[in-house]
Amino acid sequence: MKNNRSSGPEFSRKYIAHYGLRTKNLEPMVDWYKKFLDAEIQFDMGFGAFMTFDEDHHRIVIFTDDETVDKTANSAGVDHIGIGLPDFKSLVENYERLKTQGITPSLPVNHGFTTSLYYDDPDGNQVELTVDNFRTKDECREWVRGEKMAAAMKPPNFGEVFDPEDLARMFHAGASDAELSRIGIK
């Protein structure tokens, strides 16, 4: 694939405003996302809910209708939604908060340029909590464009799997961000 950015006017929005999920399991999905995102319902439609976790009016909408069918494994479409966190402290705090509510990651993986915890919602959609392993976005971009990215991005996990309990222990023992960013790397 080639990087063919338009030479015309720049795309004017620089963030994803929200995402929508269709489900057959409305209440379990709304409950899970309330816990996962520490979100609140802004508007309950009866057949769905608009929810937010920040100052915006909504970041996620979950809804159902009579025509909704179950998701199938490995179907084409969105693979996961990634939510960026500012630092390892936030990643560990969210991991521990969610664990107390019975929500644990299905895949903890160090991609080299990010450290990520992937979670499965009640419908099997993956949601990723991720933190950059470098201090600047430029350093991350340089890593992604280099040979290390090609070496790291191998199926099935596209990085090195690690135990999130090890990450939490290291964090609480005072490990630096540089040390935490190496978790799972052999």
Positions of PLM-derived features:
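Short N-terminal helix-initiation segments at or just after the protein's N-terminus
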Residues: 19-30, 61-68, 158-165
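Amphipathic alpha-helical segments
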Residues: 24-40, 97-101
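Short, glycine/acidic-rich beta->alpha junctions
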Residues: 43, 89, 109-111
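Conserved short beta-strand elements that form part of the metal-binding/catalytic scaffold
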Residues: 40-75, 94, 120, 126-134
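Histidine-centered active-site/metal-ligand motif
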Residues: 18, 57-60, 80, 111
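Short alpha-helical
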Residues: 27-28, 57, 89, 114
